[in-house]
Amino acid sequence: MKQPLKLTTRQGERIAVVAGLRTPFAKQATAFHGVPAVDLGKLVVSELLARTSLDPKLIDQLVFGQVVQMPEAPNIAREIVLGTGMSVTTDAYSVSRACATSFQAVANVTESIMAGTVDIAIAGGADSSSVLPIGVSKKLARALVDLNKARNLQQRFNILRALRLKDLMPVPPAVAEYSTGLSMGQTAEQMAKSHQISREAQDALAHRSHTLAAQAWADGKLSGEVFTAHVPPYKSPLERDNNIRESSDLASYAKLKPVFDRVHGTVTAANATPLTDGAAAVLLMREGRAKELGLEPLGYIRSFAFSAIDVWQDMLMGPSYATPLALERAGITLADLTLIDMHEAFAAQTLANLKMFASAEFARDKLGRSQAIGEVDMDKFNVLGGSLAYGHPFAATGARMITQTLHELRRRGGGLGLNTACAAGGLGVAMVLEVE
């Protein structure tokens, strides 16, 4: 094993996560219908600041992400600073790494604190699947540019005459990978077939996720990290995630038909994450600064790693590539972990990654390692449920996972937690968290 990489400042101070918060997550076109991601981001950052009673002027930087970006607000981070009463001198920039976006935001802040250029910062992400950038066809887009350049009526007429009715139809955001034309669901189907992940196993994992998430809410474990969201038209506030099946029945999952391969497929709406709206954020600072301000850290960032793999085959296998790196950089093994939280984009993808964690063949042929990182103890795995139940606002999921894991580690008296996720484009992330 290589030497661990210590994530500390030059003075040896660790990077502390002082607080984390999120909105409830809402299924597309439900409680947050019509509320753009930037407004959800403002909500969560405003509430985070209010709960920590931290002077906004002390915050040096805000790094925020959004995957489904709106053209009118391309830098969501800066709009949040300007729209929440924070100091206008607070630096802000936006990041995007698909489903790993808020992990990237946290990693960037961590590195800035380590470098000494930032003392206190907020990282997070927000996405709305209910407010989408509906575009126009390429032919119409070109015609609109040409119309702006046209010098006379005849030129304008000639441009418009070339358009057909189909060119005027609105174009929704693409659901397929730009490089391959394949959707995430199609990749999940491929992984299910390639790694022999049965429909029964997928449905069982989804049922487990919903059951554990419902129990977490019933036990009050999430109340301190999710706030009641009041959004226009202010008729009915959302207090908790509305995708969770409160009384999940395993038998009911078998009734749904496959979505992406209707003949031989196993991926259904029930064993895949739904389109979701929501926002999440975490407050980070060097541990010495937290002590100066009288703030008790939730925990610390021990290590992180990102990975990139081929997009044509097993595109969602990122956790299996990033996790060995993160564990190595933390100087630990899989057995040292108290908790493991893997993003459940699809049950098939999750189960395939768990299989590869334990595969000596995968370790040898794909990772160039002499042994597998190990079989996951399911008593440590996604103990409060996962994205299949909570939903997945793309840019917010990482911050949700970090906050949730740190709180659960504290309830268990401390330890080490792993967060890991796949992301579009063959990307992956793993992050090790520590609670004393």
Swiss-Prot record:
- Say which enzyme class the record assigns: transferase
Subcellular location field? Cytoplasm
Gene3D superfamilies under this entry?
3.40.47.10
Q: Which CDD domains match?
A: thiolase
- Main subcellular location of this protein, as a coarse class: cytoplasm
Which domain of life does the UniProt lineage start with?
Bacteria
EC numbers on record: 2.3.1.16
Q: Which UniProt keywords apply?
A: Acyltransferase, Cytoplasm, Fatty acid metabolism, Lipid degradation, Lipid metabolism, Transferase
UniProt-listed GO biological process terms: fatty acid beta-oxidation
Q: Name one Pfam family in it.
A: Thiolase_C
Which InterPro entries does the record match to this protein?
A: Ac-CoA_C-AcTrfase_FadI, Thiolase, Thiolase-like, Thiolase_acyl_enz_int_AS, Thiolase_C, Thiolase_CS, Thiolase_N
Q: Which pathway is this protein assigned to?
A: Lipid metabolism; fatty acid beta-oxidation
Q: Which reaction does it catalyse?
A: an acyl-CoA + acetyl-CoA = a 3-oxoacyl-CoA + CoA
Q: A single Gene Ontology molecular function, please? A: acetyl-CoA C-acyltransferase activity
Instruction: Show the GO cellular component annotation of the record.
Output: cytosol
Active site per UniProt:
99 (acyl-thioester intermediate), 392 (proton acceptor), 422 (proton acceptor)
Q: Which PANTHER family match?
A: ACETYL-COA ACETYLTRANSFERASE, CYTOSOLIC, ACETYL-COA C-ACYLTRANSFERASE
* Assembly notes: Heterotetramer of two alpha chains (FadJ) and two beta chains (FadI).
UniProt xrefs under HAMAP family: FadI (MF_01618)
Describe the family membership recorded for this protein in Swiss-Prot or TrEMBL.
Belongs to the thiolase-like superfamily. Thiolase family.
- How is this protein named in the record? 3-ketoacyl-CoA thiolase
What organism does this protein naturally occur in? Answer: Aeromonas salmonicida (strain A449)
